[in-house]
Amino acid sequence: MARRTTGTAGTASGRGTTVRAARRPELRLPPLTPYEDGGGLEPDGDYDALEFREADLTGQDGAGARFMDCALTGCALDEASLRAARLLDTRLTGVRGVGTNLAEATLRDVELLDARLGGTQLHGAVLERVLIRGGKIDYLNLRRARLKDVVFESCVLVEPDFGGARLERVEFVDCALKQADLSAATLTDVDLRGAAPLDLSRGVDRLSGAVISPTQLLDLAPVLAAELGVRVVAEGGTLPAV
């Protein structure tokens, strides 16, 4: 079971605005029973207090399954279908995979540690009290997902897609955010100050509700100017032809 922890609110620069910190899960897993692969995952399966260690779940179908108080360690998740699955009070450590389908899944009180994932589908998913720490995730699809109390810490996100997603109390801590897409996203109490680099491919106009550092503001200046249609030319310089 997870013990809820309350984060300490930080203070954003400018007008003394306070950003509410994300609440992190603190898992306390019960004694676990080793998972015995008797034919693989099953759609709508029920998995309670199990330890999946070095399990090869490649291509398996666990759509709609429920994982409660489980630990997945060193598992292969290539092309695994976990669509609409529920991961509750569960820890995933060192999992790897390409094309894992978690669309419309629910992740609540979950830790994802040192993962190596690519093309993971989480569109339409619900993430609540989730910690993603370490590892690298390429092309993470979070379109129209709902994220509340989510922390990305010491990880690398390459071209994550937050298009149309709703983010509330989301923190990026010592995290590389490369070519992120925020188009049509809604942000509330999103702390981006720990993202380095903070690299946005789209959606700079959706930063309302986020907190950034003065340095990040300078880094984003060219993108913001382009979004506003402002031409930046040194005094005495020649304006480009229109």
Language-model region placement:
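Tandem repeat scaffolds
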Residues: 2-242
